[in-house]
């Protein structure tokens, strides 16, 4: 089931933002999936299909991405956290039972949500995401990456090839929409650059130290989350579970969804043995 959830910002007169949400329904424990920068909720389809028999799986397009409001006025980390909280409230996901799974930038949102709202989150899964920073060159890097896209793409096959081929390339191509001359992205370049401005000036270790729920960190052997950062996360927060998918890249949830499912399922079996996976 898909629906649009309207969320409100802080402060009088803040414009509403519309979030495109997919909800499997059901009575199982809630699993909320957060995609990375410039992505879309459909990236989680393969993983969601594996969890739907036992969990209520929810995913939504982040503000500025996919079918959600494309040019929101506020793209701060705090705004993304409010979105998670308001989606959970709108769908009446039970407080204290929510499992947050976030990849890359979605993982930062998940981390900050767990730190700020311990009453809401039962467990946290960070996929290729960690609290290191600041990253001063990140806005420029993201802008150059988006500028390199040969828009419009003539067709889905060409787009998938540009994005590296395979399941990951096809998923990125699936995030495009028809427009003049071919396929176009559903993100605005300047909005994406603004979204990472906060990362250029700070790290998130303070939030990491505030997380109280069980945590699984999934690192790809060929990804961007470095072994040293994952080790430091475990050192600062004993009990953190670290899993490595050796032959996958940063989009490990697309490269090897079966491996990610196995790691998450094993983690959840420890967190809540009564919830069958």
PLM segments and residue spans:
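Alpha/beta-hydrolase fold catalytic core
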Residues: 1-31, 53-55, 93, 265, ...
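Catalytic histidine-centered segment of alpha/beta-hydrolase-like enzymes
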Residues: 248-257, 261
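Conserved HGGG/HGGXW glycine-rich cap/lid loop of the alpha/beta-hydrolase fold
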Residues: 20-67
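Conserved acidic catalytic loop of the alpha/beta-hydrolase fold
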Residues: 81-96
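Conserved serine/cysteine hydrolase catalytic core
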Residues: 182-236
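Alpha/beta-hydrolase fold nucleophile elbow
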Residues: 94-104
């Amino acid at each position: 089931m898909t629906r649009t959830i309207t969320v409100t910002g802080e402060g009088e007169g803040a414009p509403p933002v519309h979030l495109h949400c997919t909800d499997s329904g059901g009575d199982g424990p809630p699993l909320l999936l957060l995609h990375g920068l410039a992505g879309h909720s459909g990236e989680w389809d393969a993983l969601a299909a594996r969890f739907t028999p036992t969990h209520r799986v929810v995913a939504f397009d982040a503000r500025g991405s996919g079918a959600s409001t494309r040019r929101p006025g506020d793209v701060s980390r705090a705004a993304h956290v409010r979105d998670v909280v308001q989606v959970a409230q709108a769908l009446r996901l039970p407080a204290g039972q929510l499992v947050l799974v976030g990849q890359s930038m979605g993982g930062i949102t998940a981390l900050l949500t767990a730190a700020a709202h311990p009453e809401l989150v039962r467990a946290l899964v960070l996929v290729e995401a960690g609290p290191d920073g600041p990253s001063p060159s990140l806005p420029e890097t993201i802008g150059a990456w988006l500028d390199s896209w040969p828009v419009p793409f003539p067709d889905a096959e060409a787009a998938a090839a540009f994005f590296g081929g395979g399941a990951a390339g096809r998923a990125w191509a699936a995030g495009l929409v028809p427009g003049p001359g071919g396929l176009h992205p559903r993100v605005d370049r300047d909005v994406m650059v603004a979204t990472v401005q906060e990362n250029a000036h700070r790290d998130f270790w303070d939030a990491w130290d505030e997380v109280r729920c069980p945590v699984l960190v999934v690192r790809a052997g060929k990804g961007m989350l470095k072994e040293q950062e994952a080790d430091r996360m475990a050192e600062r927060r004993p009990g953190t579970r670290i899993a490595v998918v050796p032959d996958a890249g940063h989009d490990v949830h697309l490269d090897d969804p079966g491996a990610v499912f196995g790691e998450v399922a094993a983690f959840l079996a420890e967190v809540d043995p009564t919830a069958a996976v």
